[in-house]
Swiss-Prot record:
A biological process from GO: DNA replication
Species annotation: Bacillus cereus (strain ZK / E33L)
GO cellular component terms, semicolon-separated: cytoplasm
Chief localization: cytoplasm
Function in brief: Participates in chromosomal partition during cell division. May act via the formation of a condensin-like complex containing Smc and ScpA that pull DNA away from mid-cell into both cell halves.
Subunit structure of this chain's protein: Homodimer. Homodimerization may be required to stabilize the binding of ScpA to the Smc head domains. Component of a cohesin-like complex composed of ScpA, ScpB and the Smc homodimer, in which ScpA and ScpB bind to the head domain of Smc. The presence of the three proteins is required for the association of the complex with DNA.
Gene name, Swiss-Prot/TrEMBL: scpB
Protein name: Segregation and condensation protein B
Pfam families to which the protein is assigned, alphabetical: SMC_ScpB (PF04079)
Amino acid sequence: MDRTEQKSIIEGLLFVSGDEGIYPEQIAKVLEIEGNEVIDILEEMQKECEGAHRGLQIVQYAKVYRFATKKEHASYYQKLIDIPTAASLSQAALETLAIVAYRQPITRTEMEEIRGVKTDKALQTLVSHLLIKEMGRAEGPGRPILYGTTKEFLDTFGLKTLDDLPPLSEENEQMNEADLFFGSLQEISK
């Protein structure tokens, strides 16, 4: 295998290792070459990435190498972050997410009782966006899945913990409980 192919493979390894990065020893095992040679290749690649024609750089932190964007392009990355995405959540998904956030762990049936409508699609969307996940199973008939929020939920909404959620006013909480009660009452009377 020539140097160009080694660099190409290392580039891919850096990419798939993501923010965690990769140790030179791991690269050496994958490529079946000596660790010193890996270091030499990484240093060459770092120099190649230093040019103005490259958007990425290879950085080393605590013996781990990873890709990073260049600081001089930060204003462009910020513009991308500021552009609203087409993948924003629907009103139904936001309502379901709020219910999960405040009432977790919670089953799909409990969510549907609160909302008064099916939540299947909203749940699928929230799981696919990694905002909620299965937290286990409830005791009882059928052992339904319990849902809760994820670390990504906290990151997305700029929260450190669930305690940072805005408090529900007592009026809203009583209204939700009243809605739940009347919704259940209507089901029984049918």
